[in-house]
């Protein structure tokens, strides 16, 4: 996004350098959007940032309108989203974000985990409230998750715990493919049906 905001020529370069079919499809898609007066999600983020950057009066209007900002799933925000939030909240401190750096799974879609990891540096004076009690899982499951998360090289340190019982020991299923995994789970469910009804099982 940084590069696209600074140089609109990049969009044309992207079109020219793609294989012909993809280039043509994307060009038609962009034309259709323009004809319909529509924007997709990425367009909304890009154009909002350009609007706020190039028209300070518009930015100020929205800063006055959105005096308090709450962002959920902050670990999954991308650079453009981070910049919109920063522009809206800069200098005011009326920002609350909720997120878990251990649950960032959308980097393939452009999510930038640094948005949450560096939040304290980006917003000095902020308060961090760690919600470390897990209401859903047994302690054995939580311990296993903690042991894996602890190996993350960049993280916000936390010690998650459960107030539930220790629970059954975990069993690891190693599969060569998603099909093999699905078959193994289905076979286990089929086997367990003798001990309990399907209604008492969860996958």
Annotate each language-model stretch with its function.
Residues 14-118, 130-137:
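Conserved helicase NTPase motor core
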Residues 121:
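Glycine-/small-residue-rich beta-strand-loop submotif within the FAD-binding core of flavoenzymes
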Residues 124-127, 132-203:
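Helicase P-loop NTPase motor core
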Residues 6-12, 65-67, 100-102, 161-168:
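Short linear capping/connector segments at secondary-structure termini
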Residues 7-10, 28-30, 126-127:
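Short glycine/proline-rich turn/loop motifs
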Residues 1-6, 38, 93, 148-160:
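Proline-centered turn/helix-capping motifs that create local helix->coil transitions or kinks
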Residues 1-11, 21-22:
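Alpha-helical nucleic-acid-binding subdomain
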């Amino acid at each position: 996004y940084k590069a696209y905001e600074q140089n609109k020529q990049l969009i044309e370069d992207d079109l020219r350098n793609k294989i012909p079919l993809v280039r043509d499809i994307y060009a038609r898609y962009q034309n259709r959007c323009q004809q319909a007066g529509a924007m997709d999600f990425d367009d909304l983020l890009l154009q909002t940032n350009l609007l706020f950057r190039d028209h300070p009066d518009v930015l100020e209007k929205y800063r006055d309108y959105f005096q308090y900002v709450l962002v959920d799933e902050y670990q999954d925000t991308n650079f453009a989203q981070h910049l919109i939030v920063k522009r809206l909240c800069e200098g005011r401190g009326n920002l609350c974000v909720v997120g878990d750096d251990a649950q960032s799974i959308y980097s393939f879609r452009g999510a930038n985990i640094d948005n949450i990891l560096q939040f304290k540096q980006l917003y000095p004076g902020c308060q961090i409230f760690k919600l470390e009690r897990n209401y859903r899982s047994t302690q054995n499951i939580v311990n296993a998750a903690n042991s894996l998360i602890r190996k993350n090289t960049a993280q916000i340190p936390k010690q998650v715990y459960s107030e539930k019982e220790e629970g059954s020991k975990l069993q690891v299923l190693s599969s060569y493919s998603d099909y093999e995994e699905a078959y193994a789970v289905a076979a286990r469910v089929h086997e367990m049906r003798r001990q309990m009804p399907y209604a008492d099982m969860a996958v």
